[in-house]
């Protein structure tokens, strides 16, 4: 009887998000499937249990071959150049289909068309995973945010972003020109999105809050390209002990300005600094 095996735990997803170029969850899905297709063909592994546990492990592959960033294109190039089974692998691997399935699971039939202009083909699910997402921000702390100019630079599309802002009850006070989405064609870690917001706010200083390597690199790129600016980078580590340790290990030696367990702690710290009460 086949044994059910989880091929990607939280640690693997974190590994991908920490290398840069894979900030997009849908591309991570495609990268995971591509890795296991490569491993299955390269090492003639048939059983799912062995596929996960026999070397090379996915974390070792990431650390050995993908640390330069560039995400999925880098992975595709490496397999094409180094695998004797590349042609067979890429006949099986359908990136567009994989991403659509992931989008359908996330948005469900309820939002798939509105968010992604797709008619669901593979997943028969009215309510997607987006309906299970909880709001991490304490609503009482919104008053702190509104003391500042607030902009959003996100990898989500405009319709999906507006859904989230509506859920937060932010649409009534954040103007559309303060939101840069994937519809603009700008993707992190390009500094262009932040620079557009900086120009619109006429600001030389700012703080960008994220949780991935691409978020950190976006700020780094902005400060390198525009010497007159000084943006700080803040990374939210979450309350998982492994994730907190990993993000501290990776980001602090690179000059991260703020590492916080959650966005609420970060906002309270900002408020204390503003009022002169910071330790």
Positions of PLM-derived features:
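Short amphipathic alpha-helix with an adjacent loop that forms part of the alpha/beta core around
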Residues: 266-276
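Short acidic-hydrophobic, aromatic-tinged amphipathic segments that line or gate anion-handling sites
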Residues: 257-266
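Acidic, Mg2+-coordinating phosphoryl-transfer loop and its flanking beta/alpha structural elements
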Residues: 208-258
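Short, acidic loop-to-helix structural element flanking the phosphoryl-transfer center
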Residues: 68-72, 77-84, 88-95, 101-152, ...
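Substrate-recognition "cap/lid" segment bordering the active-site pocket of phosphatases
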Residues: 122-133, 151-207, 213-227
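Conserved phosphoryl-transfer catalytic core
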Residues: 1-86
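Short, surface-exposed alpha-helical segments at coil->helix boundaries
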Residues: 26, 158, 162, 191, ...
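Alpha-helix termini
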Residues: 2, 39-40, 142-143, 169-172, ...
């Amino acid at each position: 009887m086949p044994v059910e095996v989880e091929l990607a735990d939280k640690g693997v997803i974190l590994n991908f998000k920490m290398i840069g170029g894979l900030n997009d969850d849908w591309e991570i899905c495609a990268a995971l499937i591509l890795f296991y297709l490569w491993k299955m063909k390269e090492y003639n592994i048939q059983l799912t249990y062995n596929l996960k546990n026999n070397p090379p492990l996915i974390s070792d592959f990431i650390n050995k071959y993908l640390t330069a960033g560039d995400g999925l294109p880098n992975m595709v190039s490496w397999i094409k150049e180094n695998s004797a089974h590349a042609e067979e692998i890429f006949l099986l691997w359908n990136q567009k289909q994989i991403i659509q399935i992931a989008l359908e699971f996330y948005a469900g039939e309820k939002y798939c068309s509105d968010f992604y202009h797709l008619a669901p083909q593979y997943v028969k699910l009215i309510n997607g995973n987006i309906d299970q997402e909880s709001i991490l921000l304490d609503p009482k702390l919104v008053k702190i945010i509104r003391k500042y100019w607030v902009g959003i630079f996100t990898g989500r599309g405009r319709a999906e972003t507006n859904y989230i802002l509506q859920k937060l009850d932010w649409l009534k006070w954040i103007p559309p020109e303060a939101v840069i989405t994937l519809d603009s064609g700008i993707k992190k870690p390009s500094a262009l999105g932040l620079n557009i917001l900086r120009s619109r706010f006429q600001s030389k200083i700012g703080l960008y809050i994220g949780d991935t390597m691409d978020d950190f690199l976006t700020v780094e790129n902005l400060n390198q390209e525009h010497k007159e600016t000084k943006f700080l980078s803040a990374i939210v580590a979450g309350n998982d002990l492994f994730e907190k340790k990993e993000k501290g290990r990776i980001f602090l030696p690179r000059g991260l300005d703020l590492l916080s367990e959650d966005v609420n702690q970060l906002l309270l710290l900002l408020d204390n600094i503003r009022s002169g009460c910071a330790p």
